């Protein structure tokens, strides 16, 4: 929160694109954004608790709540014929929220969660955690963690000991970096992260490629859209003050209006200045609902030939 406080009090920013993880986002919302009346749009904070957090109308997110991800993950696992899983989650707001959502959805669908256990980040050794997961058993191990942290180490230890050979990877675990680190032993594992099949995603992918980065990586499109919504809401209200911006985020994000794709932000600014309504589609088919969060589409992935491959959309 210190960095966010500095941005607001010293740098005098009018809005924050962020934060990234749910715990940090919640802390900044309550300790910095609300006391100072600053709008936040997070691209990647997915905890269900943020849907009902006291926010004074200041908080939005372009990623869907993990309440939906738990259902999507259940459907993906069930559709592949698996009925029994072990579950480990990173011991924070993100991990606990996703684990609770998934366990409830999976068991309601007739599945069995043999163990639902937290793990801490940045430990030198995860043999005790892997031992407990192995003892509980299951067709698969669901790892609700981070690809650069304890989640990766638990997968590696599970492979080394033969505890599990197939893993379910939620959004925080999806990335080419973990595949490169673990190698072909991760082939056949699968999962999901926010993403949609739409014209905007294709356009954004082309723009990203031209700029030298991978546009389909987790939360890339959501980040672009979060920043775009802040700018467009400022233009719609004719003001950069957060008190005005918060009133226009939902309007520019949703129909009715002229649809705006990635790469058309300049056109959108002109339209808004001329008094037209816009419907920002963006990279992720933005549609904000209820408490100002994405309705939620997911990209289903599988690790094939040591690559993260898209195999469908949910």
Annotate each PLM feature.
Residues 1-314:
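Extracytosolic ligand-binding ectodomains
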């Amino acid at each position: 929160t210190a960095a966010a406080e500095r941005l607001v009090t010293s740098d005098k920013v009018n809005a924050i694109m962020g934060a990234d993880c749910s715990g940090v986002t919640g802390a900044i919302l309550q300790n910095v954004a609300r006391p100072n009346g600053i709008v936040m749009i997070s691209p990647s904070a997915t905890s269900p608790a943020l849907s009902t957090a006291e926010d004074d109308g200041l908080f939005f997110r372009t990623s869907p709540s993990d309440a939906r991800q738990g259902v999507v993950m259940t459907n993906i696992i069930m559709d592949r014929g698996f009925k029994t899983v072990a579950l480990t989650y990173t011991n924070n707001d993100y991990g606990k929220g996703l684990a609770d959502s998934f366990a409830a959805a999976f068991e309601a669908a007739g599945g069995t969660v043999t163990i639902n256990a937290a793990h801490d980040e940045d430990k030198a050794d995860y043999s005790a955690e892997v031992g407990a997961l192995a003892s509980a058993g299951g067709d698969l191990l669901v790892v609700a963690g981070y690809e650069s942290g304890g989640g990766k180490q638990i997968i590696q230890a599970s492979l080394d000991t033969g505890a599990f050979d197939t893993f379910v990877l939620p959004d925080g675990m999806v990335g080419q970096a973990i595949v490169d680190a673990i190698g072909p032993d991760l082939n056949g594992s699968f999962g999901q992260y926010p993403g949609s099949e739409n014209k905007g995603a294709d356009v954004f992918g082309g723009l990203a490629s031209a700029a030298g980065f991978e546009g389909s990586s987790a939360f890339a499109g959501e980040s672009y859209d979060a920043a775009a919504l802040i700018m467009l809401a400022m233009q719609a209200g004719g003001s950069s003050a957060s008190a005005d911006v918060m009133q226009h985020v939902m309007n520019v994000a949703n129909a009715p209006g002229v649809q705006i794709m990635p790469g058309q932000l300049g056109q959108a600014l002109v339209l808004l200045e001329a008094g037209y309504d816009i419907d920002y589609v963006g990279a992720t088919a933005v549609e904000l609902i209820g408490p100002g969060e994405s309705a939620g589409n997911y990209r289903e992935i599988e690790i094939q030939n040591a690559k993260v491959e898209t195999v469908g959309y949910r």
